Amino acid sequence: IGAEATAVWIGNSPLIAACAARTGLPTLNLTRELSPVLFEYNRAGAWNGHIPVTAINSAILVVAAVLYGYDGIAFSNERSASSATLEYDGQAVNHQWSKGYAFERLLHTWVHAHVAADLAYFSLLRPFSELAVTQRFARLTRYFEVFSSCNRNFRLLGPRPADRWCGQCPKCHFVFLALAPFLPKITLVGIFGRNLLDDESQLPGFDALLEYREHKPFECVGEGGESRAALHALAQRPA
């Protein structure tokens, strides 16, 4: 990125730790502790909607930056994160709003006004679409055997997949589809352990990504147009 940087992550995920180690940068691992009362509420049937993890992590990193003397916080949120998941009653609803540009500017402005006027908060990937990101990531082969974007690997409670990719969730579907135009088939299948597009039972999941008869999943995935573009590009390649 043209400047000194530290790879920072929050929590105890060995997958994230392995990716951070592959960067070759100095690392900093932060931890947080959730109140056990939260899980008691869940068991009692409390409403449990989406947790804006990026907003929470951003606040933690602001505190860490002040304590440890950093002058900037760089996320990797792409342009597509600002797009609505759907429109409801005339209002845009975005599952990943705290990854979008509107939140980024709000927090940046608030931090400057109330915390530190010289602390930058931004995303390096903001100008790029998801496909522009995956096209570049496809060249970074050192991460292929350690990275995962499967949400089931990052559950706080409950079972996790035996492998890095469950192959069933919208995140697995989207990352597979977004990487497919830019990687040889044998490499892509090697990352995921199987060809997700060969499994007819997965078709409804891919249809949702394409926004075919359904809205985009409530997950941090790319725009429907990007998924359609990826599938079109893949269709032009020999089998």
Where are these regions (language model features)?
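Nucleotide-activated chemistry modules centered on ATP-dependent adenylation/adenylyltransferase
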Residues: 1-239
